[in-house]
């Protein structure tokens, strides 16, 4: 006979070296140790999905197998070694599960993705019966939804004979339970307080801890059964509320999903399995549990077997089958041991399902072992990631706490240094913004690209004005010819006419330039205010001082910039250009000619003009030539004025003004006075850091086991 442990390996990937043994002597086994020193439960393969078959030879006849199980229950020769292995495994299970329970109790769920087992099922699927069998306590049973809040079941196995003990937690309430019979009433009361008495659903967690020698070391989260329609006085949207709540829990990548399905229904139609497939399409995190095998119609047993053998809807973690004791068993005070014995006898004597017992795929004890193995395996696998999450969250919380003063900067000297640091950081933000290097997040746009957009619009405005020169000349020349021509002969180019047309066009650009200035200064002021709110959010007085300076400097720089722009346009109305530059622009304008759309023939200059439109052509060329140079000048000059006065000077003056706050040392306490909201936030951060430090210590202590 082959050594039964030859293929044995750790549940967490660590192979075991088995020494050669005499075939007639039970093997002496080393304890397999996985990651963080967790040994493998006896009888489990490295996949943690199937257990080693029993080693006794059995005859194929069903009657002989039943007789052998019921009348001759000899212990296997390897029981001693296996029991020793189980004991060492069990000593590691509880610390492993307690670790995650302790982390979850610290209320740092937003920082960590903790492994969990969530139990879901359609209404009347037998979900509550499975949980009752695992926990050994009766749960509330009402018409409609039984579980109306997420119920966390923390089962703690006691090694030495001790009295049963339980504790229920909800809304900062802790109630001690002295007897298992008190659980049902306590849960119903908690659900009524948390979710109300009208059958509503709540996402608030209720936690129940049970210590008993008859329970496995296991933590489960019982979720409301999926209801297709409301019952009684329940809200009509109960079904949707339940689905939303379930997706919140089973959608977490670290959650193992236990789907409870009755044997006497079409598994493909169950809502619970459909929801599990939505969030876990590969079935990697899902375990199916079939219930009510005693209600299977005769002739359909093979269909159930195919489901359990993963031939219908495959799941990576496979399927198990259980027969739970019902409410009547609780009423008759059927003991836990007797109920387990009855379930085992059912499978041992069943013509079709007895083989499942051989494969450890049936009964509540095997389900408990399976769930424990899966949870421990998930915990071990995610411990490095959890440790990193705790470390990162702790560093981030400490960084945020540095924004506050009361606990970290108690003395005036410390506060002065802290204020210097705050102002220095703010001034650095201003400097980075001035040079277009400020930090940004997500889809946020930096300030300089926003300003550049306005400058681009200004450039387009100048191009449009330049393009309209021909049309303007054609519309203005008749008026100047008829109303303003002096003693000059027709077709002579009038410099005064040329100058008036240029001045009029330049003046029209003054208003858009000032409008652009106002837009840009609003952007700059808004950005600087955002930076002040970011750096000084926890210090209202300091923030107010910064905002007052920003507003004052903004008004002053807006006036300065506007005066500079008006001065620039005043100079532009003095028609002047270097001869060589103008000559080049005129040459280019003459070469380009007048566009085909210009209707020179419609000009009414007099007889001579109508016969020869050269005067109009020449005037258009001169106006275009000058306006080309003026446009280039204004296209750069106005943005330079705005950048200089509204961005750079504004930023420099603001930085200097903020440094002046350091001169009044008697005002430091006033400036660093925290508002009520900031004080509360500081307390929350301090508490969060304390919890994260505890979490980190839990991880360190666990690794040292």
Curated annotation (Swiss-Prot):
Effect ascribed to mutating residue 21 to R: In strain: 25, Black Minorca, Fayoumi GSP and WL-F
Binding site for GTP: 121-128, 222-226, 291-294
Domain of life according to the entry: Eukaryota
Outcome after substituting residue 377 to E: In strain: Black-bone
GO MF annotation, one: GTPase activity
Any Gene Ontology biological process: receptor internalization
Region (G4 motif): 291-294
Effect on the protein of changing residue 317 to E: In strain: WL-F
Record protein name field: Interferon-induced GTP-binding protein Mx
